[in-house]
């Protein structure tokens, strides 16, 4: 599985071992279910778990606690949305999505989109980053670092920015 994703295959031996440990934890703690008749294979489970484990490679796996299901659609899925404008008018629309993370609820992925990592975007990592971000109770781009009091938010942001630049 690691060889299927260049950004995972590039990890050193220690990082690969840690990624496998995090992946095993994730597979033991989350159910991965297919939607719209999708049969989720072992490769799919391992693929999702390995990619999802990258954001917590050197963090506590407990950061992914508080929810228990990953739902995988064969391709993009449609989500009904509504938005209220400044005049109070509610606009309802349907959005095509590759992924969705709900606070306290499941994480939803399009399998087709999990196979597309272009221009530095990876839907698995993106949605799992939202799960980290939502631990603080709202999505503001900064995950709760309570499990790691030694990590300083300013340093964390700088490391994230530097890592993203290298990833892209």
Could you describe each region identified by the protein language model?
Residues 12, 119-136:
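Active-site recognition of the HExxH zinc-binding catalytic motif
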